[in-house]
C-alpha cells in the first residue's frame, strides 16, 4: 500500500499511476467494495483529466464511475460522469445514460438513449437486452 500511495500521489500523471489506479479500482469492485472502487475511479478521473491528461484512461474512469454509481443508486453522479459525452458516443455509453436517466425518473429521455444504443449495437443479444429495458419502462408508465 505504501508503494501504491507513493506511485499514485508523487507520480499521479504517469501511465504507471493510471494503470495502478485502474487495477486497484477493478480489484475493489470485484471484492464488492463499490464505495472504495468508486473513490479510486474518481481519483483516476481527476488525474487523467485536462489538457495533459489521457483521454482513453479518463473515458475508462468515467465509464466505471457511471457503472458503479448506477449500481449504488447514485444516478445523478452517473449522469455527471457521462455529461461530457455527446450523442455520437458508443452504444454502451448510451445504455449507461439510459440506465441513469431511468433511475432519476426521466423515462422518455432514457428511452431515447436506449434507442440510440440499439441503433449502435451490432450484437443482437445486447440489442435484445436494451429492448427489455425499454419494454420495462413502457410497462411501468
Segments from the language model and where they lie:
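Short solvent-exposed coil/turn linkers within tandem alpha-helical repeat scaffolds
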Residues: 9-17, 46-58, 84-93, 119-128
Amino acid at each position: 500500500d505504501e508503494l501504491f500511495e507513493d506511485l499514485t500521489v508523487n507520480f499521479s500523471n504517469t501511465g504507471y499511476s493510471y494503470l495502478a489506479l485502474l487495477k486497484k479500482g477493478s480489484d475493489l469492485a470485484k471484492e464488492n467494495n463499490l464505495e472504495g472502487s468508486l473513490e479510486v475511479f474518481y481519483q483516476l478521473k481527476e488525474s487523467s483529466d485536462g489538457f495533459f491528461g489521457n483521454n482513453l484512461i479518463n473515458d475508462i474512469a468515467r465509464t466505471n464511475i457511471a457503472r458503479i454509481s448506477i449500481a449504488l443508486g447514485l444516478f445523478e453522479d452517473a449522469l455527471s460522469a457521462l455529461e461530457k459525452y455527446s450523442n455520437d458516443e458508443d452504444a454502451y455509453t448510451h445504455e449507461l445514460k439510459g440506465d441513469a436517466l431511468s433511475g432519476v425518473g426521466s423515462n422518455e429521455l432514457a428511452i431515447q438513449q436506449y434507442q440510440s444504443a440499439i441503433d449502435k449495437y451490432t450484437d443482437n443479444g445486447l440489442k435484445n437486452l436494451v429492448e427489455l429495458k425499454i419494454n420495462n419502462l413502457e410497462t411501468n408508465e
